[in-house]
Amino acid sequence: MTKEKIRVKLRGFDVELVDQSSKAIVQAVQKAGAKVCGPIPLPTRINKFTVLRSPHVNKKSREQFEMRTHKRLIDIIEPSAEVMNALLALELSAGVDVEIKQ
């Protein structure tokens, strides 16, 4: 017997926003009466960029920037229509990308 589940992936640059959004999703789903696994922290992706400080001279003088992408995974086991309505009605911050798969 296979169990139906919904997988929610959260992605963002600010770790606090990602954690707040994951807590809000877990609370909404538990309030609707479904079983939740997570939030599971996935590896943080770090993109590093090195650029010249000056456009003309001083080749040895460089500046480094990094961009961190934080990810969380939440599994909702045996969701109902009420759980889906709770997920769709949830207001999350603009800095978090939410991907829902079945």
Swiss-Prot record:
GO terms for biological process: translation. This is Small ribosomal subunit protein uS10. It holds the Pfam family Ribosomal_S10. Involved in the binding of tRNA to the ribosomes. The lineage of its organism: Bacteria, Pseudomonadati, Spirochaetota, Spirochaetia, Spirochaetales. Keywords: Ribonucleoprotein, Ribosomal protein. Belongs to the universal ribosomal protein uS10 family. The gene is rpsJ. Part of the 30S ribosomal subunit. Gene3D superfamilies: Ribosomal protein S10 domain. GO terms for cellular component: ribonucleoprotein complex; ribosome. GO terms for molecular function: structural constituent of ribosome; tRNA binding.
